[in-house]
């Protein structure tokens, strides 16, 4: 059963987004398709952030964050994973989380770095599942 109120937002990491969405009964949505209406109608967001090799956010995620930060996020729940990139971008990811919080969002988990040898996607999904 899919819950329209939970969205896994991704850029090019569809396989990971689909895996998370399937396990949570959520919908996977490309960040390129993110609209004000999506944000208003959704309660929980799982963001699959991606960085380019130089450490900059992808242009699609720059658009996505601009869209998210233009909205009132009060009462919205967020979990964040980094689909491509590593701990070097941790400062940027924490800054993004802080900006979401300033707009009223609640961040419910530690950041998962999918490319890290220490990451466990199933454990992370299990940890966020009751909170999402």
Q: In which residue ranges do the predicted regions lie?
A:
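FMN-binding flavodoxin-like domain, especially the glycine-rich phosphate-binding loop
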Residues: 2-132
């Amino acid at each position: 059963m899919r819950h329209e109120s939970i969205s896994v937002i991704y850029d090019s990491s569809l396989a990971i987004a689909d895996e998370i969405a399937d396990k949570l009964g959520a919908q996977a949505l490309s960040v390129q398709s993110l609209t004000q209406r999506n944000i208003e109608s959704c309660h929980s967001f799982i963001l699959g952030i991606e960085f380019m090799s130089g450490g900059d956010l992808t242009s699609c995620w720059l658009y996505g964050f601009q869209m998210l930060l233009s909205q009132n996020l009060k009462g919205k729940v967020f979990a964040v994973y980094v689909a491509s990139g590593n701990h070097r971008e941790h400062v940027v990811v924490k800054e993004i989380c802080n900006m979401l919080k300033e707009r009223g969002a609640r961040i419910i988990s530690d950041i998962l770095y999918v490319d890290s040898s220490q990451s466990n996607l199933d454990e992370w999904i299990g940890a966020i599942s009751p909170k999402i």
